[in-house]
Amino acid sequence: MSRRIHLALHPYGVGGPGQHGLWKDPSVAKDASIDIDYYIRLAKTAESALFDALFIVDSQFINATYPAHYLNRLEPLTLLSAVATHTTHLGLVGTLSSTYNSPFNLARRFASLDHISRGRAGWNVVTSFDTGTSRNYGLDEHLDYPTRYGRALESVQVVQGLWDSYEDDAFPADVERGVFVDPDKLHALNHVGEHFRVAGPLNLSRSPQGRPVIFQAGVSEEGRTLAAQVAEGIFAPGGTFDESRAYYADIKRRIAAAGREPDHVTVLINGSPVVRATDEAARRRAREIDEEDRDFDRSLALLGRAFGAHDFSRYDLDAPFPDVAHLAANGGRTGAAAIIARAEGEGLTLRQVAEAFAERPEPPFLGSPATVADSIVRWFEAGAFDGINLAFRNDEDLAWFVDAVVPELQRRGLFRTAYESDTLRGNLGLPFPENRHTRARTLVDAR
């Protein structure tokens, strides 16, 4: 089958990073981020448009300056379990930290979601960006990069091993023979590694898709390496056309170097299309959004999040950007380094850095339905992504994309007209993962 575009929906409730004014939008309920009906409604819309997945991001540290959605939101797997009962094909991808969760708990929770959804679960593996998270888990300091990413790799390996505890035909449930489970097809893990000692087995069988799909949002060097080693889906940062192409080429090269098939990893860039009947109407809408979000104090606070939730309000705004590189040593290092490089290279003050940090270039996917479809197709065919992780301002902005752009992509033969599978893995075009113990048994029998 020819290559087709994949789409995910990323809801931000009352407003994520940079969306300072969204909670004031009269069309957005003030409790949207904790209203399960909000998520169910969006999930049904996404499924009606044949999207691949609903993606729920998460973090576990806040202060009062954080984005509105972050201040009051639902835990991802609880949320997705509820959504699962109202959908039948839409993938359900949740973010959980490998730094602050044990592999056995991760394996059990995601396997449970995979069963509840009948094979539509995905785990977005993160190592936790906010350094303050450590203090919510009894640690004085956030773990350093090498430790966090080493732990993340081992965590995924352990979790996947636990997901293979039962072979796919381990439960004959043969009443006549009195055999519920075949003990030869139940396997302990007995993992002993640098970060974890996990015996297993997991008390939960494999799902219709074998196991949940592993996602990762690799931006740093360590993140890209981890993504290349284990990810089956990657949430890429987006940016310009050239930046996206460079990231895509780099990550696909790394996947191949890791001995994996690059076509079996779906790369989705973050994107917020602005669609209206004409290009000019879309530009007006984009200007409205920019005006709604214009808030210097909030932009300054958002800048602080890139440096460990640092409070920049106590500095002289018109002095040179302060020396704060050390504050991002264990979290958000790549983004912080880019900010510092620009500040030093252009001799910017703190005020200028905050203003530049809040700048929004014109969205690459902006205009009439045909214009937006043209841009998406150009990026896709040029090797900038396999799909887009979409975020929209409100229901109207989502409806413009669903009702006008999706049909345009379908007419061009680049987006599905029906789901290919009942599972997330199947809709992403990923192969079914054979149970490692079944594979080992097959190899022994073939000798």
Locations of regions flagged by a protein language model:
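An alpha-helical appendage that flanks or caps ligand/catalytic pockets
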Residues: 1-18, 27, 146-209, 242-245, ...
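Conserved, mostly hydrophobic/aromatic
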Residues: 7, 46, 50, 83, ...
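Acidic (Asp/Glu)-rich catalytic clusters
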Residues: 2, 44-48, 80-88, 114-120, ...
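Active-site mouth loops of central-metabolism enzymes
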Residues: 22-37, 95-104, 140-142, 208-221, ...
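N-terminal beta1-alpha1-beta2 module of alpha/beta enzyme domains
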Residues: 1-86, 209-212, 440-447
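Hydrophobic or amphipathic alpha-helical targeting/insertion segments
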Residues: 86-137, 143-146, 151-155
